[in-house]
Curated annotation (Swiss-Prot):
Keyword Transmembrane: no
Name under which the protein is recorded: Pantothenate kinase
Gene Ontology MF terms: ATP binding; pantothenate kinase activity
Name of the encoding gene: coaA
HAMAP family: Pantothen_kinase_1
Catalysed reactions listed for this entry: (R)-pantothenate + ATP = (R)-4'-phosphopantothenate + ADP + H(+)
EC identifiers of the protein: 2.7.1.33
Signal peptide: none
Gene source species: Mycolicibacterium vanbaalenii (strain DSM 7251 / JCM 13017 / BCRC 16820 / KCTC 9966 / NRRL B-24157 / PYR-1)
InterPro entries, A to Z: P-loop_NTPase (IPR027417), PanK (IPR004566), PRK/URK (IPR006083)
Location (main, coarse): cytoplasm
């Protein structure tokens, strides 16, 4: 564990230091399960789950228990009835980071691990993609070229959804996004019913503003970090893999990319990266990193070897 030379709200760890914090937390995830959770291009293995994600799951488990005790204390102070142990106040986790950095895999692995703890078996995962405006609405607002930027999301709808969850609503509905169609699926909803833990994953979930933001309702947050040059390479590699995979489906919005040569595909991917994803990362996503409870720092091979925990 390394304390920064200047006063700081963070404590830094290398992987060896961090893995020691696992204590006796058991690994209840199999190789087959991990394969299903792993995103395209991700290299996560069971060793990384043991050394990085199990200590993180243990930390979150401890914080869930502490948060519930705090809610009980507040209820006692207000003279309110103790909360139903079968319906605790949901613990909300935000997972942020760039396109292609691996935040979706991080969110899925966390969901799988946390759901195996006895005291919080209901762990739901929602991505903010569902709160993008539909393509027709983005076109009406002249925002198709800004898709993924903060203004392309229904931020009020997202705020209503998370507030409903946090307030103990019986159910809350999130729109569903199709990466195949590159659009919201009309009439389809993801129904979330009083979870113990909700994981909200997306590019801009840690953003702040003059009014109440969704990040203000988080109990814990993770930022998946890497060098910008590495993320660009991962994005291009993923694009090439999808050209022969998802893009080959005639129903895919990006089917026209499936016939590109390697050289053409790299050129197209790099153009998208530099015109959309890189500016969004630098202008909107990266500035939110200091707000995260925990920063996971990846090396060029996708492995997590540095962590920064916010202690305040």
């Amino acid at each position: 564990m390394a304390r920064l030379s200047e006063p700081s709200p963070y404590v830094e760890f290398d992987r060896t230091q961090w893995r020691a914090l696992r204590m006796s937390t058991p690994l209840k995830l199999t190789e087959d399960e991990l394969v299903r959770l792993r995103g395209l291009g991700e290299k996560i293995d069971l060793l990384e789950v043991e050394e990085v994600y199990l200590p993180l799951a243990r930390l979150i488990h401890l914080q869930v228990a502490a948060r519930q005790a705090l809610f009980a204390t507040t209820a006692q102070f207000l003279g309110e009835p103790q909360q139903n142990p079968d319906r605790p106040v949901p613990f909300i986790i935000g997972v942020a980071g760039s396109v292609a950095v691996g935040k979706s895999t991080t969110a899925r692995v966390l969901q799988a691990l946390l759901a195996r703890w006895e005291h919080h078996p209901r762990v739901d995962l929602v991505t903010t993609d569902g709160f993008l405006y539909s393509n027709s609405e983005l076109s009406r607002r002249n925002l198709m070229h800004r898709k993924g930027f903060p203004e392309s999301y229904d931020r009020r709808g997202l705020m209503r959804f998370v507030t409903a969850i946090k307030s103990g609503a019986d159910a809350a509905c999130a729109p569903v996004y199709s990466h195949l169609l590159y659009d919201i699926v009309a009439g389809e909803k993801q129904i979330i019913e009083h979870p113990d833990i909700l994981i909200l994953e997306g590019l801009n979930v840690l953003q702040t503003g003059p009014a109440l933001m969704v990040s203000d309702l988080f109990d814990f947050s993770v930022y998946v970090d890497a060098r910008i040059e590495d993320i660009e390479n991962w994005y291009i590699s993923r694009f090439l893999s999808m050209r022969a995979g998802a893009f080959a489906d005639p129903a895919s919005h990006f089917h026209h990319y499936s016939t590109l040569t390697d050289e053409q595909a790299v050129f197209a991917a790099r153009d998208i990266w530099h015109s959309i994803n890189r500016p969004n990362l630098i202008e909107n996503i990266l500035p939110t990193r200091p707000r995260a409870t925990l920063v996971l720092r990846k090396d060029s091979d996708h492995s997590i070897n540095r962590l920064r925990l916010r202690k305040l």
